[in-house]
């Protein structure tokens, strides 16, 4: 694996289990143990009912592009070889529209990305410790 020079996520006590599961190529989120709604991003208590109870739940590997931008300007030198690239809000299937993740749409020309486009999860192992969830067209 080549040296990865881009910024990496900095997990905290709430998000570390999410990143651990990504490393195992599993996308998951907290689901409230009282009201049953998803918590996204991971956090200590439910934003809906304020319960501290939760369980980690495996999520769908498919979703839909809700919104996106195409980055053309290099603000961080490590991304110079990537422009233009797509940063998208992906609404995950089977979450009752409760989870919209920010990620990249890859493996397609940026000109082909559209709102409403169905996408599938792919994992990118960027270091021996960090795996990033990204999406590609279905």
Task: Identify the meaning behind each predicted range.
Residues 66-106:
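Glycine-rich active-site loops that engage anionic ligands at enzyme catalytic sites
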Residues 62-64, 68, 124:
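Residue-level recognition of beta-strand microenvironments
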């Amino acid at each position: 694996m080549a040296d990865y020079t881009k910024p990496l996520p900095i997990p905290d006590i709430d998000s570390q289990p999410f990143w651990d599961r990504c490393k195992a190529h599993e996308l998951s989120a907290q689901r409230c143990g009282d009201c049953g709604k998803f918590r996204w991003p991971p956090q200590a208590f439910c934003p809906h009912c304020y319960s501290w109870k939760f369980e980690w739940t495996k999520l769908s590997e498919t979703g839909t592009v809700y919104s996106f931008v195409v980055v053309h300007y290099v603000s961080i030198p490590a991304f110079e070889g990537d422009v233009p690239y797509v940063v998208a809000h992906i609404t995950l299937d089977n979450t009752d529209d409760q989870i919209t993740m920010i990620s990249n749409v890859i493996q397609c020309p940026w000109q082909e990305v559209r709102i409403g486009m169905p996408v599938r999860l792919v994992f990118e192992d960027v270091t021996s410790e960090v795996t990033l969830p990204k999406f590609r067209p279905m």
